[in-house]
């Protein structure tokens, strides 16, 4: 079995993980109330989706 000859340093480990990060979710402004919401989801503030009332407050 392959075993590393030397321990991986913190610097080398962190350099390898530079691209391993969480991306920011796509936020859009609600056309009804102007509150920020996730794309393709019902607005939590006013309950509208695609210009019509979907969820009651």
Curated annotation (Swiss-Prot):
UniProt key word Ribosomal protein: yes
Keywords: Ribonucleoprotein, Ribosomal protein
UniProt-listed Gene3D superfamilies: Single helix bin
Source taxon at top rank: Bacteria
SUPFAM superfamilies from the UniProt entry: Zn-binding ribosomal proteins
GO terms assigned for molecular function: structural constituent of ribosome
Pfam families: Ribosomal_L32p (PF01783)
GO cellular component: large ribosomal subunit
GO biological process: translation
NCBIfam families (UniProt xref): rpmF_bact
Entry similarity comment: Belongs to the bacterial ribosomal protein bL32 family.
PANTHER family for this protein: 50S RIBOSOMAL PROTEIN L32 (PTHR35534), LARGE RIBOSOMAL SUBUNIT PROTEIN BL32 (PTHR35534:SF2)
UniProt protein name: Large ribosomal subunit protein bL32
Native organism: Staphylococcus aureus (strain MW2)
């Amino acid at each position: 079995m392959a075993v590393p000859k030397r321990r991986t340093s913190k610097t080398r480990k962190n350099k390898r993980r530079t691209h391993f990060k969480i991306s920011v979710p796509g936020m859009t402004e609600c056309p009804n109330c102007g509150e920020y919401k996730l794309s393709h989801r019902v607005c939590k503030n006013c309950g509208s989706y695609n210009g019509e009332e979907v969820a009651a407050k």
